[in-house]
Amino acid sequence: MDTTHNDTTPQRLMITDMRPLSLETTITSLTRDIITHRFIYLINHECIVRKLDERQATFTFLVNYEMKLLHKVGSTKYKKYTEYNTKYGTFPMPIFINHDGFLECIGIKPTKHTPIIYKYDLNP
């Protein structure tokens, strides 16, 4: 049987993403624990009080996320997680909408393996 012209020849499975899945699962879980309604509320409060632009608001979001991550896991694991986030670009990034000059964080942008997360879907 000649398989060179057969449309049903088996295709080779290509694995291009070599991230350690257990670490990704841990980071995703930690992110959901850290970024809550209260976290978003505090970011939105900073945006209004300090009249932040989108760049400043994103920086504030990331700094607060990093501080909470460090506090939650300790310095050794924190270093490992930030190296992973830097290498694979998995830092949670906020989605802002503009209300006449005031930004509101409405959720977190999707990554390759996680969907968009709206603030209404977050833990209280």
UniProtKB/Swiss-Prot annotation:
Chain positions of motif DLNP: 121-124
Cited InterPro entries: RSV_NS2 (IPR004336)
Family designation: Belongs to the pneumovirus non-structural protein 2 family.
Pfam families linked: RSV_NS2
Localization per Swiss-Prot or TrEMBL: Host mitochondrion
Known function: Plays a major role in antagonizing the type I IFN-mediated antiviral response. Acts cooperatively with NS1 to repress activation and nuclear translocation of host IFN-regulatory factor IRF3. Interacts with the host cytoplasmic sensor of viral nucleic acids RIGI and prevents the interaction with its downstream partner MAVS. Together with NS2, participates in the proteasomal degradation of host STAT2, IRF3, IRF7, TBK1 and RIGI through a NS-degradasome involving CUL2 and Elongin-C. The degradasome requires an intact mitochondrial MAVS. Induces host SOCS1 expression.
Keyword field contains Zinc-finger: no
Assigned GO CC terms: host cell mitochondrion
Lineage of origin: Viruses, Riboviria, Orthornavirae, Negarnaviricota, Haploviricotina
Domain comment quoted from the record: The DNLP motif has IFN suppressive functions like binding to host MAP1B.
Signal peptide boundaries: none
GO biological process: symbiont-mediated perturbation of host apoptosis; symbiont-mediated suppression of host cytoplasmic pattern recognition receptor signaling pathway via inhibition of IRF3 activity; symbiont-mediated suppression of host cytoplasmic pattern recognition receptor signaling pathway via inhibition of IRF7 activity; symbiont-mediated suppression of host cytoplasmic pattern recognition receptor signaling pathway via inhibition of RIG-I activity; symbiont-mediated suppression of host cytoplasmic pattern recognition receptor signaling pathway via inhibition of TBK1 activity; symbiont-mediated suppression of host JAK-STAT cascade via inhibition of STAT2 activity; symbiont-mediated suppression of host toll-like receptor signaling pathway; symbiont-mediated suppression of host type I interferon-mediated signaling pathway
Protein name stated in the entry: Non-structural protein 2
Primary location group: host cell
Keywords of the record: Host mitochondrion, Host-virus interaction, Inhibition of host innate immune response by virus, Inhibition of host interferon signaling pathway by virus, Inhibition of host IRF3 by virus, Inhibition of host IRF7 by virus, Inhibition of host RIG-I by virus, Inhibition of host RLR pathway by virus, Inhibition of host STAT2 by virus, Inhibition of host TBK1 by virus, Inhibition of host TLR pathway by virus, Interferon antiviral system evasion, Modulation of host cell apoptosis by virus, Viral immunoevasion
Subunit structure: Monomer (instable). Homomultimer. Heteromultimer with NS1. Interacts with host RIGI (via N-terminus); this interaction prevents host signaling pathway involved in interferon production. Interacts with host MAP1B/microtubule-associated protein 1B.
